[in-house]
Amino acid sequence: MPVVWDDVTRAEVLRAIQEYDRLGPEKFFSEHGFAPTTTYDLVWDERRYPPKAILGTAYEFATGQRLASGDFEGGKTGAVKVLGKLGFTVRPRQPAR
């Protein structure tokens, strides 16, 4: 069954970003059950975040239900699209320099 994103607002996404900043990547991924991004970056306040992990965590904050990474798509038709509708910028991932 597809995930319905109606309950997720900008506020939950920003809360997930704050959680990521507070915990750091490794602990965030461990606690929320996601992995680093490979294709896209959510760009906020000149920093880059893993869009699928941030959106999944925002969903958990909004609904109290935890999603697994396999429960929804992360690419253009998934997390990227949902985050864009909420007014966030998601860009193709740049190689590390």
Protein language model annotation of sequence segments:
Residues M1-R97:
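Intrinsically disordered, charged low-complexity linkers and terminal tails
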